[in-house]
Amino acid sequence: MREQVHARNWFVGLWALLLLAKIVLAARLPLFVDEAFYWQEGQHLAWAYSDLPGLTAWMTRLGVAVGGNTTLALRAPFLLVAAALPWLVARITAREFDRVQGWRAGLFTMLLPLAGTLGVLAVPDAMMTFATLLCMDAGARLLRSVSATAALELAVGLATGALSHYRFLAVLGVGFMVLLLLPQGRRALRDPRVMIAIAFGLAAWTPLAAWNLGNADAGLRFQLVDRHPWTFHADGAWFLLTQAALVTPLLFVALLQSAWRHRGDPMPVARYFAWLGVLVVAGFFGLGFFADTERISYHWPLPGYVALLPLLPSVLQRWPRWLRVATTTLACAGLLAMLGYYAAASIPALRAQVAGEKGYPHNFAGWTPLAAAVRDLRASMPADTRIVADNFKAGAELGFALGDANIAVLPHPLNVKHGRAPQLRLWGLDAIDRSHFGAHPLLLVVGASEVELKNLPAQYHALCARLGPLPPPRVVNVDHGSQRFLLFALDGEKPAGACTTPAMAWIDEPLGGDRVDGTFDVAGWAFKDGVGLDAVEILLDGSPVAHAVYGLDNAGPKRFWPISDDPHHPRVGFRAHVDASRMTGGRHWLGLRLRGSDGSVEDWSEQPVEIVR
């Protein structure tokens, strides 16, 4: 009894503390770009969308309808669902094994970093995990005896999963296969009540199927074809290391051992959990050798780990005490690391410290200063000005910040890459060119950092073809330009004339991260198609420290970008001598101020240098 009370107290204490931490993070963390698009979908209610079934969008709509247009309100339904998951795991485990193991399984549901952080973001995984647990619970009950309540729970779980994500098909397929492998499962599947539940769950896929039938299978093609190479690549071998790191190494081993130990358990429920969990994880492992490696996919196996959690306490009981302590400690560290990442992403000063690094949270950063700049510029423009974004990310994030779910978006590779182009087209928000807006003035928002440098000139010239020559932009550099936006105020009519684009530049010397003395040289190139540049200034920590000699021979940019028509080619090189002897040693940020012949002033992205003494 004392052991049970002790386990329960630890569970309740961690649950309350974790929920409080997640509420604070959900209130402070800027919206991830996918969350912003789900909000936009929620403002255009439908049964299904180009990227997902409808449930995630409906939940975002519910959140903001009840709590207002804030990040916490948007995420609140997901937080509530995520808060229920440890209790559900504890309940399932206690019923099938014992109460002490139930509290411990629930505790490790929170310590498992991928599960413990659910709800901080308004993404489908919270509901998909909830659906997995409902189906697990129903399946376990059906293995003992078929009842109307178990069949009803199965129906609700299957329908919830179908309305959550395409990936639930993996859970559905594996769960059905495992039930077929068990004699008790085959008996349950023959019962009419279970057949009705399965039919109800399958019917829940109807909205998604109907959407695809009406839109040339655009959603299916994106999820199953377009985003995956479907050719073997060795990157899938990183799956085990990545998952071991995310789950935390000892907990990962313990979960796999749980599956192995119970694979032939005399208890059908234990075998059911073991095979359900390991086959889901193994399936995604195999898929990793053929599937998409560019987008985030590390969370895909989560339903498999959740299925193994009820088996975990019995395995850990057999481990030495020091190993159990190490497992718990590592899991706590992993959970804190993931929560810490979200915390750092929510604090501009901390986020700026990793600007330019691989771990920089691009999809969380810059939206608040961008919205402030858009509001400011829009206030100086005519009342009938229309905002247009060059990609869906900026359109959705600005839409949430400004309370406008109908910001038009130009064609962009990102819209296609993330499967959002068909949905924008259905909403009538895909602005092909200037004619989409009639005679309205435009405030064009361009995410310059969303396009690789090698592709920027082509992207800028494509903007010219759609909207005409671009006027001098207002530059919004966030975190030293790791996120860089350009704002253009366009008149009502498409102007004639040659294409004028934003400036481009590169610093060849010193390179980012180089160590430099108190005095050092800066060299590189810069150009601005259509009009050219008049001057280049060198900045340190945002302040001018030198005027560069501009107009040196450098044929490289024109050779690399034949499309470029800066009138100064090939004399687009620059060099300057910087005296930073009065500055403190340590890390500083080196940047450029590019002055165009059209009067534009554009600050280029900064790069770090280390001044040594």
Q: PLM features: what roles do these ranges have?
A:
Residues 12, 76-97, 134, 138:
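Transmembrane-helix motifs of polytopic, lipid-linked glycan transferases
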Residues 15, 105-113, 137, 158, ...:
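Short helix- or helix-capping micro-motifs
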Residues 44, 138, 150-165, 176-177, ...:
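Membrane-interface alpha helices of multi-pass inner-membrane proteins
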Residues 94-100, 135-153:
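Membrane-interface transmembrane helices that cradle and orient dolichyl/undecaprenyl
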Residues 114, 120-128:
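Short acidic/glycine- and proline-prone juxtamembrane loop motifs at membrane-interface regions
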Residues 171-270, 276, 280, 284-291:
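Transmembrane-lumen/periplasm boundary regions of multi-pass, lipid-linked membrane glycan transferases
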Residues 317-351:
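Signature aromatic-anchored transmembrane alpha helix within multi-pass, membrane-resident enzymes
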Residues 358-497:
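Luminal/periplasmic acceptor-recognition loop/helix of membrane-associated glycosyltransferases
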